[in-house]
């Protein structure tokens, strides 16, 4: 008869009594339905049993102070914590209840006499989180339907809802009658709806966003309640059994009990089948009774599961939607965890990865249970979100707050104001602003753009480099080093490290230019013309957009000078440095100074001919230093000579004001981008001791590098903005949810206050009417 009421996928029922766990095949029409019987720890009573999500493993716990795992074929998978392992995770307590997480079987929670809720990682056999707050024995624990919260009840009548994201107590409630709470069940579909029951027979329906029960059935049972649960198919249907030999079903929509079924023995446990109408109850004399709540209030069948002296302490059905595992070819770990191990439900990730990174370490216990991750210099954590313009690879992910950041969150709502740390403060605290880093750049190309990760830490390891290097160079770098001087003036083009020839970035020689060392040795000994001594930089490191734009625009009228180079340098500098106009505005002021400050300006005697001539150029903020001696100015001349070479046909006598120079460069840059690219590709000759060398291969390489630079910057920026937009969207949504939750709580409180005010007003109106009536009677008598 039972074969018509259950499906093959969840036909097995686990039951515990005394120190034994038994599995029953309720679909068997004849013969012994018990398919397996085992004793986890002889002599130790079993208090709770649960099926995992694959329907292949049963977890049980009790007075043996551990969680035992058994496959349905009778094979033991060990215990948690591991027997004999001295890792500080020993339970050292009698466990009353266990519960798997809703999304998978890797994590299981437990509670008992230790007054602490523990979350165990069954893959690593370790306790990864401890949730405190109770002051008495914990009798029930359970995850909510979204694995966001974990509720627990205790003998002291406390109901605590723990936030798994922060580890904080989201809600602390107390039974209104002060009864001993022993039972707890969460709704299968509502995140904040749960039911509790205890020793005085009262059943409470709670909305955990409020401060009091949403609904109560006071002393429904005349003896302690032994079991309570929601219907899996309809959260408005609740069932409970008690030691008064009664089984009640409730309809929360009508606020009353809908049926009552009596039995010959006291009940001791209860479980709903996944179809929503098969109800199984255990009794104190070892029986397991099956009911169909749609039919007559009589048992469908009764199993003699245990002896008459043993209570059926716990019941658990298999799930109707198990995680599919190939039973012909699977390991013990697959039987326990499934074919794929789910992400951590202890700390939800704002941007979860589809596959765990190889550089991530396993989750370690901590104050917030955050999975510690290590970010290598050659690889960054990836996110599956991709932009349609960035199909070639994943983007660097935005990181939320890590475990070492201190803040308390009641509902795990991510806030961009609270959770995102300041980049400048972070760099100062790590000492990066005092580090000499301008000469060599070994960072990967994904770190060349600060906008892709600004405001987010790259991981818990503070020793890793940060993209702040690309836009905030050190003020204490060596000014006498010509390479340091030129490496402070940057370009958007990703440049290879001068010390890393096997870098993944394209080296300058691949673009058609010479190595930095060769060019430096060649140009350091050249003599410079003094025809432009009236033009000078305000300091030794004044390689700013002023110099770049002036050197390009001064020779724009000459047919022999490659105009596109100056424009390209100005465009590149403008793209990377938003405040380039602040530096370029100093040109007019500097041009009016006397020629005694700088006898010759080598920067303007020779134009830069190719982007490959210099390894890396970065902009330096040191623009205020003045020269005090003639020797210092001469050394400055040598510092600038390594990146400068003049086109042979350029006319050095053309002079323009700073405003004209900027206007002309900007007009060429904005109005003729195609011409700039074409000119840059075809008119950038390589100089070697005054000789002109040019080839078709060099032109193609330069054109390819320019297009690659623009596309790389555009796609990286678009991908970063897309990820940031998604993050902001999630933050706003979470904020709206939090606002609604707070509004609901205040609404409940205000409704109670208003109802009490209305009651007082009604009483006062009655008294007023009585007084008027008495007043009229007195007037009539007088």
UniProtKB/Swiss-Prot annotation:
GO terms for molecular function: gamma-tubulin complex binding. Residues 350-393, 467-512 are annotated as: Disordered. It comes from the Eukaryota. Keywords: Centromere, Chromosome, Coiled coil, Cytoplasm, Cytoskeleton, Kinetochore, Nucleus, Repeat, WD repeat. WD repeats lie at residues 1-34, 41-80, 90-130, 133-172, 176-216, 220-260, 262-301, 307-358. Residues 352-362, 370-386, 488-498 have a biased composition (Polar residues). Expressed in root meristematic cells. GO terms for cellular component: kinetochore; kinetochore microtubule; microtubule organizing center; nuclear envelope; phragmoplast. The keyword Nucleus applies. It is found in: Nucleus envelope; Chromosome, Centromere, Kinetochore; Cytoplasm, Cytoskeleton, Phragmoplast; Cytoplasm, Cytoskeleton, Microtubule organizing center. Gene3D superfamilies: YVTN repeat-like/Quinoprotein amine dehydrogenase. Disruption phenotype: Lethal when homozygous. Compromised asymmetric mitotic division in dividing microspores resulting in abortion of gametogenesis. Regulates microtubules organization in a centrosome-independent manner. Required for the spindle to be positioned correctly and for the function of gamma-tubulin in organizing phragmoplast microtubules. Component of active gamma-tubulin ring complexes (gamma-TuRCs) associated with cortical microtubules in interphase cells. Mediates gamma-TuRC recruitment to the nucleation sites and is important for determining the ratio of branched to parallel nucleation. May mediate the localization of GCP2 and GCP3 to the nuclear envelope. This is Protein NEDD1.
């Amino acid at each position: 008869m039972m074969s018509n009421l259950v499906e093959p996928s969840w036909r097995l029922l686990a039951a515990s009594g005394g120190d034994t766990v038994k599995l029953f095949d309720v679909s068997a029409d004849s013969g012994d339905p018990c398919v397996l019987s085992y004793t986890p720890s002889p002599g130790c009573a079993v208090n709770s049993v649960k099926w995992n999500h694959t329907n292949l493993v049963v977890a049980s716990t009790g007075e043996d102070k551990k969680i035992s795992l058994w496959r349905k074929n009778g094979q033991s998978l060990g215990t948690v914590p591991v027997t004999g392992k001295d890792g500080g995770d020993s339970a050292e307590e009698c466990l009353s209840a266990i519960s798997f997480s809703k999304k998978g079987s890797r994590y299981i929670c437990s509670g008992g006499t230790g007054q602490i809720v523990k979350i165990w990682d069954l893959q690593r056999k370790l306790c990864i989180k401890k949730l405190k707050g109770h002051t008495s024995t914990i009798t029930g624990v359970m995850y909510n339907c979204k694995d966001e919260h974990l509720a627990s009840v205790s003998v002291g009548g406390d109901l605590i809802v723990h936030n798994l994201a922060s580890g904080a107590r989201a809600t602390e409630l107390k039974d209104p009658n002060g009864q001993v709470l022993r039972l707890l069940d969460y709704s299968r579909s509502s995140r904040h709806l749960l039911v509790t029951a205890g020793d005085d027979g009262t059943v409470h329906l709670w909305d955990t966003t409020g401060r009091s029960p949403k609904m109560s059935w006071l002393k429904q049972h005349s003896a302690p309640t032994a079991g309570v649960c929601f219907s899996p198919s309809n959260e408005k249907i609740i069932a409970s059994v008690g030691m008064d030999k009664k089984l009640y079903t409730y309809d929360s929509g009508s606020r009353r009990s809908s049926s009552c079924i009596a039995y010959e023995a006291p009940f001791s446990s209860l479980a709903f089948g996944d179809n929503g109408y098969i109800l199984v109850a255990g009794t104190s004399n070892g029986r397991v009774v099956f009911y169909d709540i749609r039919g007559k209030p009589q048992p469908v069948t009764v199993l003699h599961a245990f002896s008459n002296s043993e209570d059926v302490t716990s019941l658990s059905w298999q799930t109707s939607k198990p995680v599919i595992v190939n039973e012909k070819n699977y390991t013990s770990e697959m039987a326990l965890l499934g074919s794929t191990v789910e992400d951590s439900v202890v700390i939800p990730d704002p941007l979860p990865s589809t596959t765990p990174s190889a550089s991530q370490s396993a989750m370690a216990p901590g104050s917030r249970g955050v999975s510690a991750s290590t970010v290598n210099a050659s690889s960054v954590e990836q996110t599956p979100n991709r932009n349609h313009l960035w199909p070639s690879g994943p983007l660097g992910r935005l990181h939320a707050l890590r475990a070492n950041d201190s803040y308390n969150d009641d509902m795990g709502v991510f806030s961009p104001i609270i959770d995102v740390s300041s980049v400048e403060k972070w760099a100062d605290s790590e000492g990066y602003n005092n580090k000499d880093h301008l000469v060599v750049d070994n960072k990967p190309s994904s770190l060349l753009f600060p906008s892709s990760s600004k405001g987010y830490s790259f991981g818990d390891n503070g020793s890793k480099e940060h993209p702040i290097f690309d836009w905030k160079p050190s003020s204490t770098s060596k000014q006498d080093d010509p390479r340091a001087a030129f490496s402070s003036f940057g370009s958007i083009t990703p440049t290879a490290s001068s010390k890393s020839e096997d870098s993944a970035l394209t080296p300058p020689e691949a673009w058609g230019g010479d190595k930095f060392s060769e060019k430096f040795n060649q140009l350091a000994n050249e003599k410079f013309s003094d025809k432009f001594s009236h033009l000078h930089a305000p300091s030794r490191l004044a390689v700013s957009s002023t110099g770049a734009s002036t050197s390009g625009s001064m020779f724009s009228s000459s047919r022999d000078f490659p105009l596109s180079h100056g424009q390209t340098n100005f465009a590149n500098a403008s793209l990377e440095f938003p405040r380039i106009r602040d530096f370029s505005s100093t040109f007019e002021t500097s041009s009016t100074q006397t020629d005694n400050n700088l006898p010759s300006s080598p920067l303007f005697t020779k134009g830069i001919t190719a982007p490959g001539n210099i390894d890396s150029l970065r902009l330096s903020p040191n623009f205020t230093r003045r020269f005090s001696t003639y020797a210092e100015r001469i050394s400055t001349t040598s510092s600038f000579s390594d990146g400068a070479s003049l086109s042979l046909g350029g006319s050095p006598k053309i002079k323009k004001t700073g405003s004209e120079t900027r206007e002309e460069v900007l007009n060429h840059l904005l109005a003729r981008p195609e011409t700039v690219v074409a000119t840059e590709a075809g008119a950038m000759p390589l100089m070697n001791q005054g000789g002109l060398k040019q080839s078709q291969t060099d032109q193609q390489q330069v054109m390819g590098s320019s297009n690659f630079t623009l596309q790389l910057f555009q796609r990286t920026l678009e991908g970063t903005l897309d990820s940031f937009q998604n993050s902001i969207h999630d933050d706003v949504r979470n904020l709206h949810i939090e606002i609604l939750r707070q509004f609901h709580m205040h609404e409940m409180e205000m409704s109670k206050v208003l109802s009490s005010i209305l009651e007082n007003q009604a009483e006062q109106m009655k008294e007023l009417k009585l007084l008027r009536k008495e007043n009229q009677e007195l007037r009539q008598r007088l």
